[in-house]
From Swiss-Prot:
One of its GO terms (molecular function) is RNA binding. GO terms for biological process: translation. Keywords: Ribonucleoprotein, Ribosomal protein. Belongs to the universal ribosomal protein uS9 family. It comes from the Bacteria. The keyword Ribonucleoprotein applies. The gene is rpsI. GO terms for cellular component: cytosolic small ribosomal subunit. Gene3D superfamilies: 3.30.230.10. It comes from Chlamydia felis (strain Fe/C-56). Residues 95-133 are annotated as: Disordered. Residues 114-133 have a biased composition (Basic residues). This is Small ribosomal subunit protein uS9. Residues 95-113 have a biased composition (Basic and acidic residues).
Length: 133
């Protein structure tokens, strides 16, 4: 197998059912998400700002190219999973930035998941309508 000469760091982020793999390599700021342009996959500005916030905090907005692969979940779960993956990739690249990223909550994995449905209930906690007679 041929070793690549490009220095790249790869990290994974998860949120609910969304799993995001982020490849960070030196470049000009080009971002590719599942083969689409960044603003095509994430049309809302707030989503793009949330994902790029770890880069903005460290001041590396135009220094890296990102290749992002996302599976599962909804849009918001994918956004948070990608942000976590990006923060972890930046941490691999530069270990000095851990305190800055951790204090802003970028390295924290949100453990909440969908609660399972219980038998005898309509949903996880919602019951069927009660009838006294």
């Amino acid at each position: 197998m041929v070793k690549s000469t490009i220095e790249e760091s790869v990290a994974t982020g998860r949120r609910k059912q969304a799993v995001s793999s982020v490849r960070l390599r030196p470049g000009t700021g080009k971002i590719d998400v599942n083969g689409k342009a960044f603003d095509e996959y994430f049309p809302l500005e707030i989503q793009r700002a949330t994902i790029l916030s770890p880069l903005k905090v460290l001041g590396h907005t135009e220094e890296f190219d990102l290749i992002i692969r996302i599976n599962g979940g909804g849009i918001q779960g994918q956004v948070i999973a990608t942000r976590l993956g990006l923060a972890r990739a930046l941490l691999k690249k530069n270990g000095d930035s851990k305190q800055e990223l951790k204090s802003r909550g970028f390295l924290t994995r949100d453990p909440r998941k969908k609660e399972r449905k219980k038998y005898g209930h309509k949903k996880a906690r919602k019951s069927f309508q009660f009838s006294k007679r």
